[in-house]
Amino acid sequence: MKWSAAAGAALLALPANSAVTASLPLKLETRSSLNSRLSNIHVERSASVEGAISYTYGSCQAKREEEAHHSISQPTDAHHDRLVWVIPENVQSGGCISAWSRANGRLVGRSRPQSFDFKSIKMRRDLKARATKPSDSVAIHMTTDNGINPWGPWFDGVKLLEDKEISTVDVEKAKSKNIAIVGAGMSGLMTYLCLTQAGMTNVSIIEGGNRLGGRVHTEYLSGGPFDYSYQEMGPMRFPNTITLGNETYNVSDHQLVFQLAEEMNSLNGHSKNLSVDFIPWYQSNSNGLYYYDGIKNPETGLPPTLAELAANSSLALTRVSNNSTKSLSQKVDAFLPDTDKFFAEMAQNMFKAHADWLSGGLAGLPGDQWSEFGFMVNYLRGSLNDTAFLSASAHSYWDTLYEGMYFSASTWKTIDGGLNRLPLSFHPLVDNATTLNRRVERVAFDAETQKVTLHSRNSYKDSFESSEHDYAVIAAPFSIVKKWRFSPALDLTAPTLANAIQNLEYTSACKVALEFRTRFWEHLPQPIYGSCSTTSDIPGIGSICYPSYNINGTDGPASILASYISGADWGDRWVSTPEEEHVQYVLNAMAEIHGEELVKEQYTGQFNRRCWALDPLESASWASPTVGQHELYLPEYFQTRNNLVFVGEHTSYTHAWIASALESGIRGSVQLLLELGLVDEAKATVDKWMARWIDV
């Protein structure tokens, strides 16, 4: 059936509640913008209708079901109050949704005329087509053929629902599904927030430890948050804006953190005890110290500052590199994307940038299929010696690119009182739904009942307790999940997912915080205010970060992150050193850099060491996929396997940041809502959290 554009426009002008429509027993309406190929149709009953019902879309003047443009649904469930409308590509505005009695063919319901946002629909289709363009690669390519496009704009929700054959939704039943979230880190907390705000009424959290926040861990060496002697033993900062040329951009993916803080402050009535407030983070300071080869300024007794180094380059050690190393470095730079252009793209839309990188970001080559080492040696024919000098790894350049953009940020933020205040703000929301000190170790799925059973215990000495759920969202890192037992075995039902759980690589970090009686670093001849700018060649120390909070504060002690180092070489190696020995080593390094007498007089004896590989609930710091693992594993995270949804920073496009965990929680929530046919709620979640690259 066809109707003219003029007729459609005329129909749109009709009043919404005509006498005929108002007298019918079924009220039909859409409640969200028709800007994609999916929508919910809401069904309300003013009177009962006997027998089955057919739903169609077509002319608002149609008198018979056969006159419709297309059929929407012929549900067998008489108790439905919502339909899932998969909208054909050749649809036109101006038509109405109609309901017909299948017993006698009579019209029993009709909506007001519908208007489609074709511009948005086309934009989504074009973005999807670009993200899934064919390649000669032998790697797995996720296209619209299988309904999921995980490399950039998340997944194709239309195809997902077509595959699931969902046409009607009992909303009350869907929203009462029993959902367990395993893990109360930031991805688990975000999942809980999204699902409950979407109206899910039976959501619980099972947490293996005794606190919320996971790897968000602020250590208060003296007092509380506003005694200002703390350090971040997990994440500690958020890139906010980046200036490239004459343009300044928001680092858009990290805006999720700031938006979440606003949301939690609002939910908590702006309570002072629960507030999440941001202050500037000082990433760099020109008075940071440069301590290499034992060189110090004889006048101050301190290493040269970065400002002094800039004024006198002879103070810096110069690494000898031969011409072939320089040439190889220049060749690599020529193949990588233009820095300013790609940094701007990543800042504005990390997800589109990721898709572009995978499809041909390495000068036309698929970005995730070349490791740094393999590209230099096998493609550019660099020597092993030159490649070693350039620190080529088994990872692709993606991590180098997005971390390069983040650490080029012009402004940064952190949370006043410590990042712990972000998970702290969730307590009023989740406490009644959270079970602490329950470590899930086994997961069983019953295909007949479609139920998930979680087996957990507090200690390895305890017997297992079990709980049954309709779905489980796994928000624990794979470094822990790899020790779990699944029934049926995942390598039989989802071998690529099982491969990801067992083989996704992680990086470990160690941090040592030391407390001092005063903020002595702010009273040096060239005072240091915040920043991680002090560096040295003392083995195993890495970054030294001075606090960005309470700058020029006069009361009480303060703490320095005296060592922050990661990677297989030191993040793993330090765990074999006893804590007291490790702390003494770091204290000695601080004394060597800042002056032995000063440091020993100022040190209070309070410290904290956290090597994340020793944490029984984490076993590592963050995911660090090797070459090919993004391209191979990301599609698996977008598929619901045995009623399990996997979230966490390890399932995101970037790693090691709170924003990565939050993004995965939003994605997992939308994935589950779409599984249940709650399209309007999925759209609302997407729109609220600005994740508009999902096609729903």
Curated annotation (Swiss-Prot):
Residue sites binding substrate per the record: R237, Y564
* InterPro entries named in the record: Amino_oxidase, FAD/NAD-bd_sf, Flavin_monoamine_oxidase
Source domain of life is Eukaryota
Q: Which residues form the propeptide?
A: 1-130
Record protein name field: L-amino-acid oxidase
| Positions of disulphide bridges | none
Sites where the protein binds FAD: E207, R215, M236, R237, V440, E649, I658, A659, S660, A661
Gene assigned in the entry = lox
List required co-factors.
FAD
Question: Pfam families, per this entry?
Answer: Amino_oxidase
Name the chemical reaction catalysed here. Answer: an L-alpha-amino acid + O2 + H2O = a 2-oxocarboxylate + H2O2 + NH4(+)
Similarity remark: Belongs to the flavin monoamine oxidase family.
Describe how expression is induced or repressed: By addition of L-amino acids after nitrogen starvation, by starvation in phosphate buffer and by the addition of protein synthesis inhibitors, D-amino acids, or ATP.
- Recall the taxonomic lineage recorded for the source organism: Eukaryota, Fungi, Dikarya, Ascomycota, Pezizomycotina
- Which keywords has UniProt assigned to this entry? FAD, Flavoprotein, Oxidoreductase, Zymogen
Enzyme Commission no: 1.4.3.2
What SUPFAM superfamilies does this protein's entry cite? FAD-linked reductases, C-terminal domain (SSF54373), FAD/NAD(P)-binding domain (SSF51905)
GO BP: amino acid catabolic process
Q: Which GO terms describe its molecular function?
A: L-amino-acid oxidase activity
